[in-house]
Amino acid sequence: MEKVAFKMEHISKSFDNGKIKANVDVSLVVYENTVHTILGENGAGKSTLTSILFGLYKPDSGKIFIGEKQVNFKSSKDAVKHKIGMVHQHFKLIENYTVLDNIILGNESRFGFLPLINRKVSEAKIKTIMEKYGIFVDLKQKVSNLTVGQQQRVEILKVLFRDSNILIFDEPTAVLSDLEIQNFLKIIANFKKLGKTIVLISHKLNEIKQVADTATVLRLGKVVGSFDVKTTPVDKIALLMMGKELKQTKNTTDFVAKDEPVLKVQNLNLFLNKSLAYKFLVRCNNIHKAQQIKKNKPLKDLWIISFLNKLTTSNKTPKLVKGLINKLGLSYQENTDETISFAIHKGEIFAIAGVEGNGQSQLVNLICGIEKAASNKLIFNNIDISRWSIRKRINAGISFVLEDRHKYGLILDQTVRFNTVNNQINNRPFSSWNFLKPMEIALYSNTIIKKFDVRGSAEGSAVVRRLSGGNQQKLIIGREMTKQNDLLVLAQVTRGLDIGAIAFIHENILLAKANNKAILLVSYELDEILALADTVAVINKGRIVGMGKRDLMDRQSIGRLIMQ
């Protein structure tokens, strides 16, 4: 007979004095040594429910049992004592600390009664855990130098270090590349073999089918179904999640360029740019040269490229320095002289395909103005904007939806209403003579909230930090797509969204195309690119290795180019 790992009975939770009902009379049972997934749309109450299980929130009503024993968690410390661990969607790591210090933080081994940390004991335990579960990370590295996938492994090691038996993962694959996703799914399968109980929040039904045993579906905070994953068809799961059948969204028009390009990218080098050179020189303690770059002193761009090329290709360069160059996103020994060029026209969806880490982030950052390239030209509506600030580019008519929504898209401790206008608040009709117009802002904000179904917003008064990750993303997308701009730059625009929200965003991208907007779509989801793009460019190691119309760029040809 299966043993109960935990059960939750009649759990209810609301926020903002009952305005937002996150969970309504939710009950579920999870058995030991199984993978149980919690499914639902963005804002369905999945993260709230697991946060209650982890002690981050207290339920308004209901009971929690670990095994057969009822518990009352006052904080996450109580949950940890009961062998529950949680890996959050947004990692809780200190970037300036090493991997080792992040793992042991709050649970350090001491030298007897002395206030000194015994790192050797902790390090030995972590290495044993890494060997047992096949999860390896360099313990001496700073977290700031790790990839997203490696940071996730640090979070997993943190919960294993605390001897957790019930492991909760909130949207674990939302920020991972395809290869990292496959590695993560192997880790989950291994956890199950070794006796762990897994709770998985995800929107990706193909991943759920691979690893989950059972599932519970939430809709508007209520349970609408529980079932065996292996025997339930994907279509039925999607129907339970959405409450309706979804139509497939696909670009069926044949694009023909009729006008001058809205955006021309000329001779852009994705790996050698001033920003990264500056960081590199600071790390190498060459402060004088670094300051020259930062202050735009008369220092030839060619010098930077020459310096870096000589340094990175030299056999005398220490491995430590070459490793540092890699961490900064620089390429060495190949493709340092490669540049890319392309153009995007009105009414065109120009998609960038490729495996993560091949220059996509650098490309978007250079177009947005976050980074300045060593030598390039960016022509927007026949004007060279290469040296323009981010603000000037926005005011000129470029909209951005970037990968890191917390860093570049939102002010988390401000309201939803403020965030709908935060990069245009000084413009009409939202202000006049330096005075804000609250009625105009509220009207505009409510239009975006309703059109893009931003749930949990309390008519714009809710703090953005309170929203689910998917609803935060919908807020940014709604804000940027509502602007009357000529160019949309969309990077990983549907990452973290449920299947219904993805279909809705795809419809709006095609609507923007129909309204003659030029769209740059950067995505690691090949299905998304094939469904939406007019033109597909495949990027590999910082250069375009293939480009063509959608009809000529099928899955096989794109796959071959990606793997070159």
From Swiss-Prot:
Keyword presence, Kinase: no
Domain of life: Bacteria
Molecular functions (GO terms): ATP binding; ATP hydrolysis activity
Cell compartment(s), UniProt: Cell membrane
Annotated keywords: ATP-binding, Cell membrane, Membrane, Nucleotide-binding, Repeat, Sugar transport, Transport
Membrane topology type: Peripheral membrane protein
Gene Ontology CC entries for this record: plasma membrane
Domain ABC transporter: 6-245, 315-564
Alphabetical list of Gene3D superfamilies matching this protein: P-loop containing nucleotide triphosphate hydrolases
Any Pfam family hit: ABC_tran
Keyword Nucleotide-binding: yes
Binding site for ATP: G40, E41, N42, G43, A44, G45, K46, S47
InterPro entries (UniProt xref): AAA+_ATPase (IPR003593), ABC_carbohydrate_import_ATPase (IPR050107), ABC_transporter-like_ATP-bd (IPR003439), ABC_transporter-like_CS (IPR017871), P-loop_NTPase (IPR027417)
Function: Part of the ABC transporter complex involved in carbohydrates import. Probably responsible for energy coupling to the transport system.
Family: Belongs to the ABC transporter superfamily.
Protein name, UniProt field: Putative carbohydrate transport ATP-binding protein MG119
Lineage: Bacteria, Bacillati, Mycoplasmatota, Mycoplasmoidales, Mycoplasmoidaceae
